[in-house]
Amino acid sequence: MQEIPLNAVPNQRLRVSLGGDEWELTIKVARTTMCCDIKRNDVILLQGIRVVPNQPLIPYRYLSGNGNFAFITENDELPWWEQFGQSHSLIWWGEND
């Protein structure tokens, strides 16, 4: 399992190499919740998914490939950008975790 650093800003895009794949996540505010777009190796997997705490971001095993992401929060709070890097973090885990 690996923590992915996030900035405490409302909208951001990040690219990381994990599990032999190139991932691109776009995290953005959608009114009072956070949404996410996910690409793996420049292929769009998901767009506009609502981010919920302590659950895999990619809900389908066949799309997740060699790993998956999740937002870990205190007290099952909905992930919110102002708490990134404090009590809300993004993690990735691979097949061996």
Role assignments for model-derived ranges:
Residues 11, 23, 32-34, 43-45, ...:
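Generic "edge-of-domain/loop-turn" microfeature
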Residues 1, 39, 43, 76, ...:
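Compositionally biased, intrinsically disordered low-complexity segments enriched in polar/Pro/Gly
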